[in-house]
Structure formats: structure tokens, C-alpha cells
Design a protein with these regions (language model features):
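Intrinsically disordered, low-complexity proline/glycine-rich segments
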Residues: 1-158
Length: 158
């Protein structure tokens, strides 16, 4: 079981996320300045690039590719209708279900077991998410998936 706190910071129009484990920064996520769509680089605590979230802008539905440690980790697609807070993640067969306001999310596997939960917290500046997940190996993946759900459901461009 693992837990993360992911806090979005907006500085001079640039999006960044700080990811903490036990109140210590473990990852930083930075939106690429020049990109078509929403592309984010994920860095570990010492600045090594460990992941990428790449939005595909030519699709009818919001679609994001995930790459972690140089390996493709699948695609996440927002579901229709546009008012729902649901997404599908093809790599693990997971589904993301969100409540109507987009404040509480759960990731379930093909047998409908809950693999992770994400709760959006209301704070003054930026979005903050508390993430709990069942498999410690999914830590970096949960960073990428949480950034995707923030971009898909809480971005001003959504």
C-alpha cells in the first residue's frame, strides 16, 4: 500500500506538480513549455527524468500516452459523454470512475477490485490530490495517472 500527496503549483502560467511521500518531495512534474497539447515530464527527487505524459490532440476524446523509465505504459482515454468523469486505461485494463464534481476518483481493475483512490482537496492555490494505492510498484504510474485526471477534468482548457 502506498500514499502520495500531489500538489499543483502555477507559476507565471507554468504548471508544476510536487509529489510528496511522507511529507518529503519524491517527484516533480513539469508541463512542457512548448508542446502541442498537454505534455508533462516527470522527474525524481534528484532531477532525473523518469516519465512522460503526452496528450494526443488530434483525437476526438482526450487521449494521453504514458511512458515510465523509457517504457510505454499504455494509453488513457476520456469516456463519452463529456459530462462523465470516467476514463479507461488500456495497459492494465483499469477504469477510472469519478464522482459528478470530479473530487473523488477510484481506479478499478478488470475484476472490479479497487486498485487506487484519488481525492481532490480544496485549497487556495493549485489543485491538491491525496492518492492511496494497493501496489507499491504503481507509485510512479499513479503520479502520471493523477496528472492526467487533473488535466482532463480540472484544467481550464478542459
Amino acid at each position: 500500500m502506498g500514499n502520495l500527496v500531489i500538489h499543483q503549483k502555477v507559476k507565471a502560467g507554468l504548471e508544476e506538480y510536487e509529489v510528496k511521500v511522507n511529507n518529503v518531495v519524491k517527484y516533480k512534474v513539469k508541463k512542457k513549455l512548448i508542446a502541442v497539447g498537454a505534455d508533462f515530464d516527470i522527474f525524481d527527487a534528484v532531477g532525473n527524468k523518469v516519465g512522460l505524459v503526452d496528450q494526443k490532440v488530434l483525437n476526438m476524446v482526450k487521449t494521453f500516452d504514458i511512458t515510465l523509465n523509457g517504457q510505454k505504459f499504455g494509453t488513457v482515454k476520456k469516456e463519452f459523454p463529456a459530462l462523465t468523469k470516467d476514463m479507461k486505461y488500456d495497459y492494465k485494463g483499469w477504469k477510472l470512475d469519478g464522482d459528478l464534481l470530479g473530487m473523488n476518483f477510484k481506479f478499478t481493475n478488470a475484476s472490479n477490485s479497487v486498485m487506487a483512490t484519488v481525492q481532490k482537496k480544496v485549497v487556495a492555490f493549485g489543485d491538491t490530490y491525496e492518492v492511496a494505492f494497493t501496489d507499491a510498484q504503481d507509485e510512479l504510474l499513479m503520479v502520471a495517472l493523477t496528472v492526467i485526471l487533473d488535466e482532463a477534468f480540472h484544467s481550464k482548457r478542459s
